[in-house]
């Protein structure tokens, strides 16, 4: 089995396991950070390839078609972890669009591939995604809503890259009288 075929298979299993647990709904935002260098067993930022990026991008697009989620592709630290998204998504949520073109050496291979293969791509600086996937320890946490909830899948690596996934939940707020699950005794004023 070639490395690319293995990466595709691992990604398919990981996304399927994730969806089974997280139940993402149409319209929710899914952020992806990825080091294609780490996927190939190299140090982050040193050996990214468009071939690996294409394989990962195409699997993520299939996941999007199956679930109706919106994708956001995180750039590398050289672009302050900005995100490549469809312009329609940026306009819908009034995300501020910034002017930059991701390239493999400043943006990363996956974000660059996404920028050149989405319908109408733009780059934004900030997002609060409903869920996400981090391939190669790229640190997507800054782009997740509070509170991040880790989701464990049967896949621990994509290629040679460590993979983590998370969904989010609303904060539990309040003090001593706060109630988090409605019960008969908490609804009435007796």
Swiss-Prot record:
SUPFAM superfamilies, alphabetized: TTHA0583/YokD-like
Pfam families xref list: DUF436
Classification via NCBIfam families: TIGR01440 family protein
HAMAP family: UPF0340
Family named by the database record: Belongs to the UPF0340 family.
The name this protein goes by in its record: UPF0340 protein BCE_5442
UniProt lineage: Bacteria, Bacillati, Bacillota, Bacilli, Bacillales
């Amino acid at each position: 089995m070639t490395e690319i075929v293995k990466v595709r298979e691992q990604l398919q299993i990981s996304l399927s396991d994730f969806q089974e647990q997280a139940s993402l709904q149409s319209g929710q935002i899914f952020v992806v950070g990825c080091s294609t260098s780490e996927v190939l067993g190299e140090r982050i930022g040193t050996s990214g390839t468009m071939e690996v990026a294409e394989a990962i991008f195409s699997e993520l697009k299939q996941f999007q078609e199956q679930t109706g989620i919106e994708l956001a592709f995180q750039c590398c630290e050289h672009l302050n972890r900005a995100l490549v998204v469809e312009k329609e998504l940026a306009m819908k949520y009034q995300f501020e669009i910034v002017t930059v073109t991701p390239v493999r050496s400043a943006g990363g291979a996956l974000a660059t591939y996404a920028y050149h293969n989405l319908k109408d791509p733009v780059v934004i600086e900030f997002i609060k995604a409903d869920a996400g996937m981090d391939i190669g320890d790229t640190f997507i946490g800054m782009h997740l809503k509070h509170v991040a909830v880790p989701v464990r899948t049967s896949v621990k690596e994509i290629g040679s890259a460590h993979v983590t996934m998370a969904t989010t939940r609303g904060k539990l707020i309040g003090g001593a009288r706060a109630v988090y699950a409605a019960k008969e005794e908490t609804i009435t004023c007796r």
